Amino acid sequence: MKSAVLVFPGINRERDMARALRLVSGREPAMVWHAETSLPEGTDLVVAPGGFSYGDYLRCGAIAARAPVMDAVRAFASDGGLVLGVCNGFQILCESGLLPGILMRNARLKFICHDVHLRVERSDTPFTRGYNAGQVIRVPVAHGEGNYAADEDTIRRLEGEGRVLYRYCSASGEVGDTHNINGAAQSIAGIVNERGNVLGMMPHPENHVEDIMGCTDGRGLFAGLVAHLERAA
Amino acid sequence: MKARVTVTLKAGVLDPQGKAIEGALKSLGVDGIASVRQGKVFDIELDGDKTKAEAALKAAADKLLANTVIENYRVEVLG
């Protein structure tokens, strides 16, 4: 899997992401500076990592979404290329129009930084094939604006088309207000675009990929992408 | 020429910051506050004539200053 990690000023999770990609795919990802106008030849996966691009000024991800490299990412996505956005990366994908909706301030206003449980809603997508449908995984979150919001029609479409891939839940997989850490509509933690090749999620799977991290539940996401690309090749 | 773009959340969009400020004002004993919505103000200086300035400000708001999924904006040329 030939991956590219986007690097914007202020981003601080790009090396965690690169480490996870290297570990699971066995290949060194390319680091792509925001001012670039193209992606490396043969890129299979583009990742917008977490961090605080441009200091979260204006709205989270708003400035990064207008960076030169994003035109290349949009073209890559419209050709069917796989794009993953984590945390600030999710915010960037929403702001850039690659995903619908927006991430608002957490409903209870606090910055949240701890492990959460996620229910994997289906396993027949490139982003979830490393898991079983209904499986509960544990991954960390670290965000102040992760409260997913969209108009009613969009939410209805996301649900109806099975585009919610990850949802906040309890350790045993129950979804409800008490487990919805940031107030997101329908407890949404991660969604895909209509075509199914662009995923945005608030939690950080790249931070649960090695035993030393205390948990390896995040590995399945990357392993699934590798398996998907190997099968396609 | 000076101009101002005001960005506010659309009606019906939950505004947790506004709610927190509303609660703080109530606890400070400021009377008569029914509700608070928080927004943003951009003070911008431009060159050129007023028609061009208005078009530029609208483009700025549409392209970057506001996210029209959840926000409305108002453009004023202050002269």
From Swiss-Prot, chain A:
Gene Ontology cellular component annotations, sorted alphabetically: cytoplasm
Ranges of residues in domain Glutamine amidotransferase type-1: 3-233
SUPFAM superfamilies, alphabetized: Class I glutamine amidotransferase-like
Keyword Secreted on entry: no
Enzyme Commission designation: 6.3.5.3, 3.5.1.2
Active-site annotation: C87 (nucleophile), H204, E206
GO MF entry, a single one: glutaminase activity
Keywords, sorted A to Z: ATP-binding, Cytoplasm, Glutamine amidotransferase, Hydrolase, Ligase, Nucleotide-binding, Purine biosynthesis
Top-rank taxon, per record: Bacteria
Pathways involved: Purine metabolism; IMP biosynthesis via de novo pathway; 5-amino-1-(5-phospho-D-ribosyl)imidazole from N(2)-formyl-N(1)-(5-phospho-D-ribosyl)glycinamide: step 1/2
NCBIfam families, per the entry: FGAM_synth_I, PRK03619.1
Role, per record: Part of the phosphoribosylformylglycinamidine synthase complex involved in the purines biosynthetic pathway. Catalyzes the ATP-dependent conversion of formylglycinamide ribonucleotide (FGAR) and glutamine to yield formylglycinamidine ribonucleotide (FGAM) and glutamate. The FGAM synthase complex is composed of three subunits. PurQ produces an ammonia molecule by converting glutamine to glutamate. PurL transfers the ammonia molecule to FGAR to form FGAM in an ATP-dependent manner.
Subunit (UniProt): Part of the FGAM synthase complex composed of 1 PurL, 1 PurQ and 2 PurS subunits.
Protein name, entry field: Phosphoribosylformylglycinamidine synthase subunit PurQ
Underlying gene: purQ
